[in-house]
Amino acid sequence: MPPKKDTKASAKQPQKTQKKKEGSGGGKAKKKKWSKGKVRDKLNNQVLFDKPTYEKLYKEVPQYKLITPAVVSERLKVRGSLARRALIELREKGLIKQVVQHHGQVIYTRATKGDDPVA
């Protein structure tokens, strides 16, 4: 019997080269790029009240349904510490009513006509 020709080996080689071209290998995956983080604009809030802002505080803030230092700071463009002190002043004059005080967060609401000023 003559030796058989190795038909399997010759058939395998072309397939290997084709597989490399198709799948481009299962080695390293493409490296993920770092995303550019979101950039916030710097807040330039007032440190002291000027006349128009102070009048706005007395006119508009007592009409808000939910009053917190953060809300006042954002709407009137004043610092948080200034907003805190302003709300204490409004509460003492009876224009707003304190609802909750928990650690650093204080929540006020508008004073209704039937309420007595809270001391």
UniProtKB/Swiss-Prot annotation:
Domain of life of the organism encoding this protein: Eukaryota
InterPro entries recorded: Ribosomal_eS25
Intrachain S-S bonds: none
Annotated Basic residues bias: 28-37
UniProt-listed Pfam families: Ribosomal_S25
GO cellular component: ribonucleoprotein complex; ribosome
Keyword field: Ribonucleoprotein, Ribosomal protein
Region (Disordered): 1-42
Keyword field contains Ribosomal protein: yes
Family: Belongs to the eukaryotic ribosomal protein eS25 family.
PANTHER family reported in the protein's UniProt record: 40S RIBOSOMAL PROTEIN S25
Name used for this protein in its record: Small ribosomal subunit protein eS25
Name of the gene encoding the protein in the UniProt record: RpS25
